[in-house]
């Protein structure tokens, strides 16, 4: 079929949420003429649920996005109202940053960034169809009948695909925050042959700040110590005038109200059909599943400096409006609170992610990429990370360059994508530190060391950032080398000082680096014995040095595991492999292989239901028959 296109682009991104913004900024910065199409310009990078960025594992993803040259970290550093490092009492592998956002300012700042970006056109329009010829994308069709040509299309529609809002017995077609739903595009994706799933998520009510009795709650302040998501942000710019959050709890009265109205709860009455998030359940679900718990935490989170809206984190619900009011008034500090918005549930279509490659391109259609909640994830950070990778790979495909695949040992983003494309997901997927087997090398403090060079190679890291990174890396390397070369000897003067500080004396000579491996010896103590570095070191470099030195043995073990797995990751499986021709593999393994069509032995080994014997048989088969190369 011959199409008459009115406009021509290299890449078209459908949807301007957190995934779409990162995808379109990446493609345009890599030199591709890009269209970012959105149903509503006023909802670009909008936060329809929680007014925060980061958190456990998620905060590390934001640092990874920043290291690769993405935008989320820089944007939240300009628009936060509170910053807090989580898990400071635990090991470095699980520490992560979390920021309360001024949600309207966050969206405004991101919109400004998109509007001034070269090669990027921003358009309010609804895309109804993705145009495909001979198995590859050629463009899109708008609801107004316009046809735009494209060499690649990235679908980042969030919860808008056949979205339906549910509040008590009320159910109506809608995207998030009462925006338009994308119904025709949902039909089109199904017609193209993609398998579609149905998920559900929800949001809590918002209450008026001036109607809260804060004396009945516990204050939750931000950190005084400067921290940032972007490696380019300066400590001097750290916000001193932060806004606190507040902690309160449900109680037995709250639980009674919910239990007495379960028959009116869409979750239990059969109105809700979609699968909800395991790690962010509704309050009614929590009360039923954890009936033995006397109370549940609720955090009162301001939505910005210039609004009275307060987000009641932990109270996600789709109960009827009158029940929500009673529930709020049963909670300490909220007895007289004014509900400004009701909570609601939203059901939406997703593209089942086992149909994707690790580049986030669909296996079925060349040039069609999907990212974010469209792939079954939850969270702004997970969406942004996928959007960045999908955008990068869309640009690389258009330019005829090698694709970018982040491995599980490279980044949490790599862990997430591998989980999605290898295991799929039966519920909204959330990143957790426990999902990463190499989490000690995927830390908050070393994301730039892991990923900045990759960002530079693909063209997203500019000269200013690259120069700053090179200075930091050289300072780190030089100081590590110095500490490993200077020796402390067990002489009287040294041991007298060691004992004065309350530490065990030295029995043998050791390097300053070995001295720092002692749990009680920090960098400042070590250099008090051996002298300071040739130049003043930033606190972040010192933190990195301490972690790398104190956990060196564990880090080395993790890197050894990575090296072993690398051999399996490099063993490719031909795209044209005949799974039925492999004798002796288990029926379940054969079925899973056919469904997922893994690209490497490493990926095949991580598929649920596949055992080591199946992998051994597969490797023997490939050594004898696997001569073909995978092509897309």
Swiss-Prot record:
Main location: cytoplasm
InterPro entries: FAD/NAD-bd_sf (IPR036188), GIDA_C_N (IPR049312), MnmG (IPR004416), MnmG-rel (IPR002218), MnmG-rel_CS (IPR020595), MnmG_C (IPR026904), MnmG_C_subdom (IPR047001), MnmG_C_subdom_sf (IPR044920)
SUPFAM superfamilies: FAD/NAD(P)-binding domain
Binding site for NAD(+): 276-290
Pfam families xrefs: GIDA (PF01134), GIDA_C_1st (PF21680), SAM_GIDA_C (PF13932)
Domain of life, per lineage: Bacteria
GO biological process: one example: tRNA methylation
Gene Ontology cellular component list: cytosol
Matching Gene3D superfamilies: FAD/NAD(P)-binding domain (3.50.50.60), GidA associated domain, C-terminal subdomain (1.10.150.570), tRNA uridine 5-carboxymethylaminomethyl modification enzyme MnmG/GidA (1.10.10.1800)
Keyword tRNA processing: yes
Subcellular location: Cytoplasm
Cofactors: FAD
Single GO MF descriptor: flavin adenine dinucleotide binding
Positions that bind FAD: 15-20, 127, 182, 373
Record keywords, A-Z: Cytoplasm, FAD, Flavoprotein, NAD, tRNA processing
Matching PROSITE patterns: GIDA_1, GIDA_2
Protein family: Belongs to the MnmG family.
NCBIfam families: mnmG_gidA (TIGR00136)
Protein's job: NAD-binding protein involved in the addition of a carboxymethylaminomethyl (cmnm) group at the wobble position (U34) of certain tRNAs, forming tRNA-cmnm(5)s(2)U34.
Assembly and oligomerization: Homodimer. Heterotetramer of two MnmE and two MnmG subunits.
Name of this protein: tRNA uridine 5-carboxymethylaminomethyl modification enzyme MnmG
Lineage: Bacteria, Bacillati, Bacillota, Bacilli, Lactobacillales
Chain's gene name: mnmG
């Amino acid at each position: 079929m011959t199409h008459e296109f009115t406009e021509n682009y290299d890449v078209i991104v459908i949807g301007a949420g957190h995934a779409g913004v990162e995808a379109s900024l990446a493609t345009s910065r890599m030199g591709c003429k890009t269209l970012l199409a959105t149903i509503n310009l006023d909802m670009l990078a909008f936060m329809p649920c929680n007014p925060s960025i980061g958190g456990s594992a998620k905060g590390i993803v934001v640092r990874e996005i920043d290291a690769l040259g993405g935008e989320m970290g820089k944007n939240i550093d300009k628009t936060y109202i509170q910053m807090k490092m989580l898990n400071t009492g635990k090991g470095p592998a699980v520490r992560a940053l979390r920021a309360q956002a001024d949600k309207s300012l966050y969206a405004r700042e991101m919109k400004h960034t998109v509007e001034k970006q070269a090669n990027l056109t921003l358009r309010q329009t609804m895309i109804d169809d993705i145009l495909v010829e001979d198995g590859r994308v050629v463009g899109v069709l708008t609801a107004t009948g316009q046809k735009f040509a494209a060499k690649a299309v990235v679908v980042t529609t969030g919860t808008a695909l056949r979205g339906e809002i549910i509040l008590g017995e009320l159910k109506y077609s809608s995207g998030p925050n009462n925006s338009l739903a994308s119904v025709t595009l949902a039909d089109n994706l199904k017609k193209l042959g993609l398998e579609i799933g149905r998920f559900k998520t929800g949001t809590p009510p918002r209450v008026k700040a001036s109607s809260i009795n804060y004396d009945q709650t516990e204050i939750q302040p931000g950190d005084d110590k400067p921290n940032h998501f972007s490696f380019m942000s300066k400590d001097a710019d750290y916000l001193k005038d932060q806004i606190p959050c507040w902690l309160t709890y449900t109680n037995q009265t709250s639980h009674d109200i919910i239990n007495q109205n379960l028959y009116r709860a869409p979750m239990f009455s059969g109105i809700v059909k979609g699968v909800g998030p395991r790690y962010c359940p509704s309050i009614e679900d929590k009360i039923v599943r954890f009936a033995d718990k006397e109370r549940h935490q609720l955090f009162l989170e301001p939505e910005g400096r210039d609004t009275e809206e307060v987000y009641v984190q932990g109270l996600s619900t789709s109960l009827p409006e009158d029940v929500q009011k009673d529930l709020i008034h049963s909670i300490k500090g909220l007895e007289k609170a004014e509900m400004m918005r009701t909570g609601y549930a939203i059901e939406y279509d997703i593209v089942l992610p086992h149909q994707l490659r690790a580049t986030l391109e669909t296996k079925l259609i060349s040039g069609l990429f999907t990212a974010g909640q469209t792939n079954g994830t939850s969270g702004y950070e997970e969406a942004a990370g996928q959007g960045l990778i999908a955008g990068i790979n869309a640009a690389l495909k258009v330019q005829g360059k090698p694709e970018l695949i982040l491995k599980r040992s490279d980044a949490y983003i790599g862990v997430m994508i591998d989980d999605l494309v290898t295991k799929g997901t039966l519920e909204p997927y959330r990143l957790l530190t426990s999902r990463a087997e190499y989490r000690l090398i995927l830390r908050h403090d070393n994301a730039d060391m892991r990923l900045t060079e990759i960002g530079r190679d693909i063209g997203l890291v500019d000269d200013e950032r690259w120069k700053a990174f090179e200075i930091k890396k050289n300072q780190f390397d030089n100081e590590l080398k110095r500490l490993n070369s200077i020796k402390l000897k067990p002489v009287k003067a040294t041991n007298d000082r060691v004992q004065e500080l309350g530490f065990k004396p030295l029995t043998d000579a050791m390097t300053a680096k070995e001295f720092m491996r002692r749990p009680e010896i920090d960098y400042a103590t070590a250099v008090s014995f051996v002298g300071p570095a040739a130049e003043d070191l930033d606190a972040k470099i010192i933190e990195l040095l301490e972690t790398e030195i104190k956990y060196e043995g564990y880090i080395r073990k993790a890197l050894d595991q990575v090296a072993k797995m690398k051999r399996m990751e490099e063993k490719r499986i031909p795209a044209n492999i005949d799974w039925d021709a492999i004798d002796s593999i288990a029926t379940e393994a054969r079925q899973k292989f056919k469904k997922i069509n893994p690209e490497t032995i490493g990926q095949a080994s991580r598929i649920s239901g596949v055992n080591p014997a199946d992998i051994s048989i597969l490797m023997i088969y490939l050594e004898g028959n696997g001569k073909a190369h995978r092509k897309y």
